Amino acid sequence: WFYRCEALKQIEGLEYLNTSEVKDMSGMFSDCAALTSIDLKNFNTQNVTAMSSMFHHCAALTSINLKNFNTKNVTDMGGMFLNCAALTSLDLKNFNTKNVTDMSWMFYNCAALTSIDLKNFDTKNVTYMGRMFSGCAALTSLDLKNFNTKNVTDMSWMFSGCAALTTINSNTTWQCPESKDMFAGCTKLKGAVSYDKDKVDATMANPETGYFTAESTTVRSR
């Protein structure tokens, strides 16, 4: 629709778009590099199954209104906000992610994002989380206590480059596959132990001998 409208700074009249039958919104605003804000509160997304790369490389975007998004049928959110480097906040509290299988690269290089509330995220069906938060250089903490990772097969580089990240709160059932460079560049991260640049793989994804923080947990690496 608006793919690679690189000089586009604003969009008017989106409330008149009938999106009730749309199933695929992948790449819809991808590479709208000059767009600074977008209000999608009137979008009907009840039938959408794919939102991958929807806002990919919207590098100047500072705000997105997604409060009325119905995501109950969405299965693919991979790269959804990839390289939204100017976003400082993102309200996803209404997101229903129960059917999502791909969250890889979802917030990759959201370099100005200082916090994100994912407490309502249902991740029981997610299989891909590789690079999910990679490059989120301004994030200081992540609360992932509600994350169910039993079906995840790839967490490679999941938190890599999160240079300001000090705390990752995990739950008691976090399971982690063997994943390369999961914590690379997370130099301020501290859980049970402080960060060690030579220990950045999935073996450190636990709160007992690794970088996660939790009251009492048993975390398994498979």
Task: Report residues per predicted region.
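Negatively charged
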Residues: 1-222
